[in-house]
Amino acid sequence: MKAVVLAVAVLFLTGSQARHFWQQDEPQSPWDRVKDFATVYVDAVKDSGREYVSQFETSALGKQLNLNLLENWDTFGSTFGRLQEQLGPVTREFWDSLEKDTDWLRQEMNKDLEEVKQKVQPYLDEFQKKWEEEVERYRPKVEPLGAQLREGARQKLEELQKQLVPLGEDLRDRARLHVDALRTKLAPYSDQMRDRLAERLTALRDNPKLAEYHARATEHLKKLGEKTKPTLEDLRQGLMPWLESLKAKALSVLDEATQKLNTQ
């Protein structure tokens, strides 16, 4: 499991665009980013799982059962790889279709957000400026107290804390006033953005393409079922003999252990 966590952490820390940066490839599409993440995760699961299977086979119980788990694990990995290859084109077609059909909504929302951002930016700048002024206003009051702490003994710490509490409470109260003032100024824009979002969602709901998209999604799921059915059946057929062998050997070991207990 550590390998899985490490792989996912590396992907998030480096970003799925790392390959584009180093190799100067074209920027990845959303589907490519999802596919890369899924591939890294699945590969990590397979690798870590194979490691655990190998450890079990080398154990005393694994040698006694002789299940050939590694061989079956590799077969499973090969079958799963074929399943990924079959799903790729169909899923990408569906993703591209979804992205294309909702592109207009994304553009409108980005336009709305940019418009609101330009209107509220002066208020945000004003808030930041006032907050910096408040911090500078309290700095001369706090710095002498810090010097006293460095120069004084431990017994002065409690006295220093008492002096800091009123200053901290005063700064907190003034910050709340600025936050409340900012919230009041931004409220109309928040309501405006919420109303616009409601309008966009209503337009999306009334769009004739929505019914068409629902039909596409249904057809996509149907295609996925048709594509994966043969491969899943092959996987099931391949695992059944191994599962039956596992069951038989486990029962054999259990019977042997029971007989030993009865003879004691």
Swiss-Prot record:
Glycosylated. Palmitoylated. Keywords: Cholesterol metabolism, Glycoprotein, HDL, Lipid metabolism, Lipid transport, Lipoprotein, Oxidation, Palmitate, Phosphoprotein, Repeat, Secreted, Signal, Steroid metabolism, Sterol metabolism, Transport. It is found in: Secreted. The keyword Cell inner membrane does not apply. One of its GO terms (molecular function) is cholesterol transfer activity. The modification Methionine sulfoxide is found at M109, M193, M240. Sequence repeats lie at residues 67-88, 89-110, 111-121, 122-143, 144-165, 166-187, 188-207, 208-229, 230-240, 241-264. Residues 1-18 form the signal peptide. PANTHER family: APOLIPOPROTEIN (PTHR18976), APOLIPOPROTEIN A-I (PTHR18976:SF11). Homodimer. Interacts with APOA1BP and CLU. Component of a sperm activating protein complex (SPAP), consisting of APOA1, an immunoglobulin heavy chain, an immunoglobulin light chain and albumin. Interacts with NDRG1. Interacts with SCGB3A2. Interacts with NAXE and YJEFN3. Belongs to the apolipoprotein A1/A4/E family. This is Apolipoprotein A-I. It comes from Nannospalax galili (Northern Israeli blind subterranean mole rat). The lineage of its organism: Eukaryota, Metazoa, Chordata, Craniata, Vertebrata. The gene is Apoa1.
